[in-house]
Each structure stands twice: as structure tokens, then as C-alpha cells.
Amino acid sequence: MKIGIVGLGRVGSSTAFALLMKGFAREMVLIDVDKKRAEGDALDLIHGTPFTRRANIYAGDYADLKGSDVVIVAAGVPQKPGETRLQLLGRNARVMKEIARNVSKYAPDSIVIVVTNPVDVLTYFFLKESGMDPRKVFGSGTVLDTARLRTLIAQHCGFSPRSVHVYVIGEHGDSEVPVWSGAMIGGIPLQNMCQICQKCDSKILENFAEKTKRAAYEIIERKGATHYAIALAVADIVESIFFDEKRVLTLSVYLEDYLGVKDLCISVPVTLGKHGVERILKLNLNEEELEAFRKSASILKNAINEITAEENKHQNTGG
């Protein structure tokens, strides 16, 4: 598998390392506006290949993406302490459009995973600018949020996170929606399990949801950025592609019409295999969850409209 990574900040470089450890890539091209940074990362990773599976890793340009099976986009300006993901939109949209033009030119048949925040909006801009197959362009979405929530529940209840089944959908950010109505542990509905183990109630579950939502902010306050967990999440996404696992993951995908949400990239459960997104699964949400999901979609739609209006303004004024 040939993998291209655009953007070698902490997320991009951590992702490259995670992929090397997984052993998927026979070839990995690293692209960054700071060519020396990309060269340094390539050398550092190459020196680790005696301890991993052999891989050809090098710094390159967009033209070197030719023949890539997967392209991971992690380029963008970093999130500041206290800054919401949506506030990042204006500073990253133009960067994403430029990347989209280059990826579609040199690797039009690749599967593209957008990681840069705000991931839902930037995935939408990438898709529209590139004109690529919507099944092959998606964002990392709420894969990490889902993992965080499962971990919190598992730690509290004394189970493995792998035995906890609950999804976080919607925006990867402040308006994300935990789907409690479909949550299960070992095949037992979470509400029933709570009655059995008597370790939690609705307030504790709400606290878990809030902790999941605030997790990135908490980490950023302490160390400036999140990068290890998201890198592992992206490597997990690539694993599903590489092995054609057809796993169900909450990715930010383009929706033509999903529970009333149209023309938007937002996280919902999908099956992912070697050809990209194969199926979009419609959840049976309760009224409260459906309302929250549509509200989340509305927030993202407004953000897209705002940045589009600003772009048009710049073009009309020659800015």
C-alpha cells in the first residue's frame, strides 16, 4: 500500500509513526510546506525500519502522490487553547482547497482521509473542490470521540472498551451527539446494564458525554495539541481499508439526504472497506437524539455558508 501524508505537524508525524508500526505501507510519501521538516521526519522514520516491516519513506511534493492508495490530509494551522474547532474554519478552508486541487490532480483514484479540524467542514470543502468520488473522501469524524466515550463507560463499569457499543455522531466538536438509545454492553442495553451493576445513572452518563466533548480542550490546555490518539484512530481507519474489514466506523461522510440532513459532511456510522465507504447506516434515533443531530448539522451548515459568503466577498473585491 502506498500512503501519502500531507501536513507533518504533530498529527501528521504521529500518524506516519503509527502507520509504520502497523506495517501497512510499502511506500510512504511525506509532504509539508516546510520541506526540511518532512525530510527530517522521513529520516527519523527510516532509521526505525530495522525494527518494523520494511517501507520506502521519503519527503516529496504533490506529484509524488501519484499511485497512492490512501492520502491523509493533516495540514492546517494548530488549534489554540480555548478555540473551538469551528473557529479554525476560516484559517484552514483556503489551505484545504489548495490541497484538494493537488490531490485530485495527482491521485484522483486514492481514498482521502481528512483529519484537519474542523474536520466536518473541511472535508466538505475538500470534496467540493476536488470533485472526487464521495465514497472515497471522508473525514476522521467522531471515531476518536466514540472511542473516548466507550473508554469512559468501560472504565467506570469494569468492562473492556471493545465490549462497549455506543456511537457518537454529528459534528466532531461541541455539538456532537451520543446515541444512548442504541448503547449496549455485551449485547445488553446500557440502560438495563445500569440497573444490573448500579454503578451509574443518567447524570453520570451525561457527565461522560461532557467529558468526551471536552477531552480535546483539556489536553490542549495541558500540552498544546492532541496527536497520539487521533494518529492511532487514523491508523485504525487505514487498517479497515487495507484488510477490507468492512468495519462500522463513525466517519464524516457526505450525506445527500440522511434523516433530513442534506448536502453536508457529518459523522454517522458507515461500513468501510478497500473501496472506501460502502454503506451508510441509518440509525433509529429517538426524538431527542434526532433533534440534537439536526441541530449539529445546522451548526455545520451555517459555518459552511459563512465561509462561502466570505470567500465570495474576497473574490468580488479582488481580495
Curated annotation (Swiss-Prot):
Protein's UniProt keywords contain Calcium: no
Enzyme Commission identifier(s) = 1.1.1.27
Which top EC class is given?
Answer: oxidoreductase
- Which keywords accompany this UniProt record? Allosteric enzyme, Cytoplasm, NAD, Oxidoreductase, Phosphoprotein
Q: Name one GO molecular function term.
A: L-lactate dehydrogenase activity
| Activity control summary | Allosterically activated by fructose 1,6-bisphosphate (FBP).
Which is a GO BP term held by this UniProt record?
lactate metabolic process
- Which pathway is this protein engaged in? Fermentation; pyruvate fermentation to lactate; (S)-lactate from pyruvate: step 1/1
Gene3D superfamilies xref list: Lactate dehydrogenase/glycoside hydrolase, family 4, C-terminal, NAD(P)-binding Rossmann-like Domain
List positions binding NAD(+).
V11, D32, R37, Y62, G76, V77, V115, T116, N117, S140
Locate the active site.
H172 (proton acceptor)
UniProt-annotated binding residues for beta-D-fructose 1,6-bisphosphate = R150, H165
Q: Where does the UniProt annotation locate this protein?
A: Cytoplasm
Q: Which reaction does it catalyse?
A: (S)-lactate + NAD(+) = pyruvate + NADH + H(+)
GO terms under cellular component? cytoplasm
SUPFAM superfamilies for the chain: LDH C-terminal domain-like (SSF56327), NAD(P)-binding Rossmann-fold domains (SSF51735)
Q: Which residues bind substrate?
A: Q79, R85, N117, P118, V119, D120, D145, T146, A147, R148, T226
Question: Which Pfam family name is an example for this entry?
Answer: Ldh_1_C
Per the record, residues carrying Phosphotyrosine are: Y217
In terms of PROSITE patterns, this protein maps to: L_LDH
State the InterPro entries in the record: L-lactate/malate_DH, L-lactate_DH, L-lactate_DH_AS, Lactate/malate_DH_C, Lactate/malate_DH_N, Lactate_DH/Glyco_Ohase_4_C, NAD(P)-bd_dom_sf
Role according to the record: Catalyzes the conversion of lactate to pyruvate.
Q: How does it assemble?
A: Homotetramer.
Its family?
Belongs to the LDH/MDH superfamily. LDH family.
Q: Which HAMAP family match?
A: Lactate_dehydrog (MF_00488)
Kindly provide the name given to this protein in its UniProt entry.
L-lactate dehydrogenase
Q: What is the originating organism of this protein?
A: Thermotoga sp. (strain RQ2)
GN (gene name): ldh
